[in-house]
Amino acid sequence: MKLRLSALALGTTLLVGCASSGTDQQGRSDPLEGFNRTMYNFNFNVLDPYIVRPVAVAWRDYVPQPARNGLSNFTGNLEEPAVMVNYFLQGDPYQGMVHFTRFFLNTILGMGGFIDVAGMANPKLQRTEPHRFGSTLGHYGVGYGPYVQLPFYGSFTLRDDGGDMADALYPVLSWLTWPMSVGKWTLEGIETRAQLLDSDGLLRQSSDPYIMVREAYFQRHDFIANGGELKPQENPNAQAIQDDLKDIDSE
């Protein structure tokens, strides 16, 4: 169920971003917009169509779905201890122990995490959107800082992307060498791009794709930091979306 909520949230943030494109309205900082638009054009008009998207299409079409699921489960399992720590830091020991249990069961019984044994055994142990250190900072109201579009990386803020580097201090992530970390990041990026292939039309139809991507980034991280909730006072469409999420959760 949580995965369904996360998937819907990811999709709806793309739509919500169009209706709330004002940086001042959202309280976002984008002082480098000129530079960011240049980097966006490189990332999404050069790098994506000629390199990233073809790789993602090949990944989706030629890698069997069970193999994709297994690799996604494995890379996600590496983050479970860090997610556990972040829930403890947020004052939520119950969710912290949920992620400890997921890591223990999937590592021992799930071939090192390739099989999500915990999620199959108990719906309360299903995989969720990971809470990283950036989410913990957001939980306590720390601001994003300036928004930046980085070449090859995409959207970046000091709070969420810079803060997430703290997660690498915890095992198992701290055990990874630099090439291993790059490999993990690459696999996750390709899988994420493959999942979003069917959403390419949203960007093509947008009058300002840069604004759409920027606001989708903020909306997604707000959603995670707020524990899976959208605040109506921050967006005029949030209440309607929140009602849809509740309807799905009640199924």
Curated annotation (Swiss-Prot):
Its main location: membrane. Keywords: Cell outer membrane, Lipoprotein, Membrane, Palmitate, Signal, Virulence. The keyword Membrane applies. A lipid is attached at C18 (N-palmitoyl cysteine). It is a lipid-anchor. It comes from the Bacteria. Residues 228-251 are annotated as: Disordered. Residues 1-17 form the signal peptide. The keyword Acetylation does not apply. GO terms for biological process: intermembrane phospholipid transfer. One of its GO terms (cellular component) is cell outer membrane. Pfam families: MlaA (PF04333). InterPro entries: MlaA (IPR007428). It is found in: Cell outer membrane. A lipid is attached at C18 (S-diacylglycerol cysteine). Involved in a phospholipid transport pathway that maintains lipid asymmetry in the outer membrane by retrograde trafficking of phospholipids from the outer membrane to the inner membrane. Required for intercellular spreading of S.flexneri. Belongs to the MlaA family. PANTHER family: INTERMEMBRANE PHOSPHOLIPID TRANSPORT SYSTEM LIPOPROTEIN MLAA, LIPOPROTEIN VACJ-RELATED. This is Intermembrane phospholipid transport system lipoprotein MlaA. It comes from Shigella flexneri. The gene is mlaA.
